[in-house]
Swiss-Prot record:
Gene3D superfamilies, sorted: Aminomethyltransferase beta-barrel domains, Aminomethyltransferase fragment, Probable tRNA modification gtpase trme, domain 1
Function: The glycine cleavage system catalyzes the degradation of glycine.
Subunit structure: The glycine cleavage system is composed of four proteins: P, T, L and H.
Gene: gcvT
Primary enzyme class: transferase
Protein's UniProt name: Aminomethyltransferase
Keyword Transferase: yes
Length: 370
């Protein structure tokens, strides 16, 4: 099967990127090397092509009324020009996807628009789940990314760089805020969408824009000596920041409470959503497994599938693991039996036939300086 390619694919080739198959897309794993790319984001700025991710548009008169049932979070808790991290759940409270939902406000007359930026591997599942269960013709569902690029600039200098490129300030936009507007002095190809969000633990922007404009933005960033970054650095950055990766840390057999995302579930509001009955019971009965952070002694890295033990007893399994360039420690996420999940509890991780001591920590291993 032919792999999908971003409109920026030619830039990968020019930059001698190392390419891999990721969720059916041919994507860069690295450009100049994972450590250099990681440190560029932590110390100044770096940028990522994230066009493999999906963007779903929901349009209608008050679309929140019709789509609320897909999300455990109260959609009326955020308003036009804002984004919200949330989940799509199945009937048993399992996580179909984690995503950010954006309220773009009115676009044409009384028609409002919502954007969902979803994981690459889950786009088709998300799209069909919503379309097949919407049960109304009052809201249209479509792909908002056709022939466009999703580019992410991350790091403490990201806002300044973007302001220089567009020629105006974005200081009025709050964290998780967004805008959807024309920049006619840059492009006449259509509106740009951008938000103050990211997947690195740093200040950052995610920008949906026409292909030629994305090429121009790439060239501008390179001219400012900003490092293009691949999926390798994106993974180490997100794990340091304590952020989940769907397919490793989240899946349809795992609930928000087990994943440490119970704060996204609003049971106080009366709105119905898929999985509510199951989650109400689980919130009362408790969970059997829990996602925790681990710091592993030495330099051995606990990768996905490594088993976790306590006093020779198997208690869980690692879902994500890496060497942290920032903390200079081996870090990981693991699902373990809840009775062993207390902070600072010392466990053992089996790595290539040898056990290494590990300490249970909070999942965020890094927090940026304010």
């Amino acid at each position: 099967m032919d792999l999908l390619k971003s409109p920026l694919y030619s830039k990968y080739i020019e930059s001698n990127a190392k390419l891999i198959n990721f969720a059916g897309w041919e994507m860069p794993i690295s450009f100049s090397g994972l450590i250099n790319e990681h440190e560029s984001v932590r110390t100044s700025a770096g940028f990522f092509d994230i066009s493999h991710m999906g963007v779903i548009s929901l349009r209608g008169i008050n679309p929140k009324e019709y789509i609320q049932k897909f999300f455990p979070t109260n959609l009326y808790s955020f308003s036009e020009g804002q984004g919200l991290y949330t989940l799509i759940l199945n009937e048993k409270g399992g996580i179909i996807d984690d995503l950010i939902i954006y309220d773009l406000g009115r676009q044409e007359g009384d028609i409002s628009e919502i954007f969902l930026i979803v994981n690459a591997s889950r786009y088709q599942d998300d799209f069909l789940w919503i379309k097949n269960n919407l049960n109304t013709n009052q809201v249209s569902v479509s792909n908002a990314k056709t022939d466009k690029v999703l580019l992410s600039i991350q790091g403490r200098n990201s806002f300044t760089l973007f302001e220089e490129w567009i020629g105006s300030s974005i200081s009025h936009i709050p964290y998780f805020g967004c805008e959807y507007k024309n920049f006619d002095h840059i492009s006449t190809e259509g509106k740009f969408f951008f938000s103050k969000t990211g997947y690195t633990g740093e200040n950052g922007l995610e920008i949906l824009l026409p292909a030629q404009s994305a090429i121009n933005l790439w060239d501008f960033l390179v001219s400012r000596n900003i490092q293009p970054c691949g999926l390798g650095a994106r993974d180490t950055l997100r794990l340091e920041a304590g952020m989940h990766l769907y397919g490793q840390d989240l899946d349809e057999k795992t609930t928000p409470y087990e994943a440490g995302l119970g704060w996204l579930v609003n049971l106080e509001n009366n709105h119905e959503f898929f999985g509510r009955d199951f989650l109400e019971k689980q919130s009362k009965l408790g969970i059997k497994k829990k996602l925790v952070g681990l710091t592993i002694e030495g330099r051995a890295i606990g990768r996905k599938g490594c088993e976790v033990f306590k006093d020779e007893k198997y208690i869980g399994i690692i879902t994500s693991g890496t060497w942290s360039p920032t903390t200079e420690k081996a870090i990981a996420f693991a699902y373990i039996q809840n009775s062993y999940a207390a902070l600072n509890n010392v466990v053992e991780v089996l790595i290539r036939g040898k056990k290494f001591k590990a300490t249970i920590t909070k999942r965020a291993f890094y927090k940026k300086d304010i």
